[in-house]
């Protein structure tokens, strides 16, 4: 396979057929979908979004949180919590984890998100830190909201999405 995401054709053949068998209340069944949901009842829909980033800068975790939260906001879901998994190269030290956690805590406090789980491990096959963020939220009355699109509620590169791009530009300019 080539580097990066698999193509939609490969995803349909190898993934979609497997997960489609008994799961009728879920969404997010395309290779390019950034979030998915599980309809619990007519009143509640649990929605989550995952983002992976890698790189040397501990600030990468900030972009991942903003991206995951932004994906939920684009679906009219207020993010409430994040779960974090971090893979480090064996050459990493504890200070890298502390730096990532400091930034993670700051961004979660700013955005009102709680941190529900943090897993960190090192592996010999990892060349630079890889951070996986999963944000979750609950959409109230999902069926009713899908029917009502109110003018002026469109998201056009603002909020978390616009913030992520702006922060990346600022960090690059300062470097």
Regions inferred by a protein language model and the residue ranges of each:
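Helix-biased detector of long, well-ordered alpha-helical tracts
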Residues: 1-175
């Amino acid at each position: 396979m080539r580097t990066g995401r698999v193509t939609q054709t490969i995803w349909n053949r190898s993934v979609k057929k497997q997960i489609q068998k008994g799961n009728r209340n879920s969404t997010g069944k395309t290779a390019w979908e950034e979030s998915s949901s599980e309809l619990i009842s007519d009143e509640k829909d649990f929605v989550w979004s995952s983002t992976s980033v890698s790189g040397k800068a501990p600030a990468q975790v900030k972009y991942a949180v903003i991206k995951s939260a932004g994906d939920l906001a684009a679906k009219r879901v207020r993010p409430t919590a994040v779960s974090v998994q971090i893979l480090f190269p064996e050459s990493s030290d504890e200070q890298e984890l502390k730096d990532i956690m400091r930034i993670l805590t700051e961004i979660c406090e700013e955005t009102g998100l709680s941190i529900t789980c943090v897993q960190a491990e090192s592996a010999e096959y990892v060349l630079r830190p890889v951070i996986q963020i999963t944000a979750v939220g609950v959409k109230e009355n999902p069926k009713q909201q899908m029917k009502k699109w109110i003018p002026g509620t469109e998201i056009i590169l603002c909020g978390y999405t616009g913030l992520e791009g702006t922060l990346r530009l600022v960090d690059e300019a300062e470097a």
